[in-house]
């Protein structure tokens, strides 16, 4: 065997080995690329899922906030309507006719006075516009006297000199009590359909 043949055999063997190594490297590179592409696809799908979940969370949060704001607006509107109803009732009480005012005030005066002992002097306070009415109603009650003004829609506040008892029989206090008792019914009639 000649040297050229040996060199040729070594070269052929080296080329075959190089081709084998190259093919193996290409196969491994292709496998790595396929795995990387699969990983990239998985990562892309994960990111898409995360983005979709984030979008859904933000959408739910926005809907929840909008629903809460709408509910608050409805409640505020209802409160405004109820306040308007209460103000209209107060206006009607403040502008009662003299006959109606006397009809409503007389039992309040009597009820207030009966809360005190028979021998106790009772001082009654009323709104300034009702001073004459109160003085005429007190003509029937010897132990009671008009003592001055009280800021209210009508009715009386009575105080005993000895017992330090105070009875609030004003239209305001009665309206407050009735309003608290009937607020649910009023609200239901106005808003439930």
Swiss-Prot record:
Protein name: A-type ATP synthase subunit E
GO-annotated molecular function: ATP binding; proton-transporting ATP synthase activity, rotational mechanism; proton-transporting ATPase activity, rotational mechanism
Subcellular location: Cell membrane
Origin superkingdom: Archaea
Alphabetical UniProt keywords: ATP synthesis, Cell membrane, Hydrogen ion transport, Ion transport, Membrane, Transport
Bilayer disposition of the protein: Peripheral membrane protein
CC annotations in GO: plasma membrane; proton-transporting two-sector ATPase complex, catalytic domain
NCBIfam families on file: PRK02292.1
InterPro entries noted in UniProt: ATPase_E_C, ATPase_V1_Esu
Signal peptide range in chain numbering: none
Main location (coarse class): membrane
Record family assignment: Belongs to the V-ATPase E subunit family.
Single GO biological process annotation from the record: proton motive force-driven plasma membrane ATP synthesis
Assembly information from the UniProt record: Has multiple subunits with at least A(3), B(3), C, D, E, F, H, I and proteolipid K(x).
Source taxonomy: Archaea, Methanobacteriati, Methanobacteriota, Stenosarchaea group, Halobacteria
Function in brief: Component of the A-type ATP synthase that produces ATP from ADP in the presence of a proton gradient across the membrane.
């Amino acid at each position: 065997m000649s040297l050229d043949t040996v060199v040729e055999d070594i070269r052929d063997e080296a080329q075959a080995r190089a081709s084998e190594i190259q093919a193996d490297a290409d196969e491994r590179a292709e496998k790595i690329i396929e795995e990387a592409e699969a990983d990239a696809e998985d990562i892309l799908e994960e990111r898409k899922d995360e983005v979709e979940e984030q979008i859904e969370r933000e959408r739910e949060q926005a809907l929840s906030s909008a629903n809460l704001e709408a509910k608050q607006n409805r409640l505020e509107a209802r409160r405004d309507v109820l306040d308007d109803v209460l103000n209209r009732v107060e206006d009607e009480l403040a502008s009662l006719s003299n006959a109606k005012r006397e009809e409503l005030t007389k039992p309040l005066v009597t009820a207030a006075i009966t809360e005190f002992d028979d021998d106790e002097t009772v001082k009654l306070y009323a709104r300034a516009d009702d001073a004459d009415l109160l003085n005429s109603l007190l003509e029937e009650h010897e132990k009671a006297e008009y003592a001055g003004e009280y800021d209210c829609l009508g009715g009386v506040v009575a105080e005993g000199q000895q017992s330090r008892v105070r009875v609030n029989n004003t239209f305001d206090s009665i309206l407050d009590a009735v309003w608290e008792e009937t607020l649910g019914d009023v609200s239901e009639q106005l808003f439930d359909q």
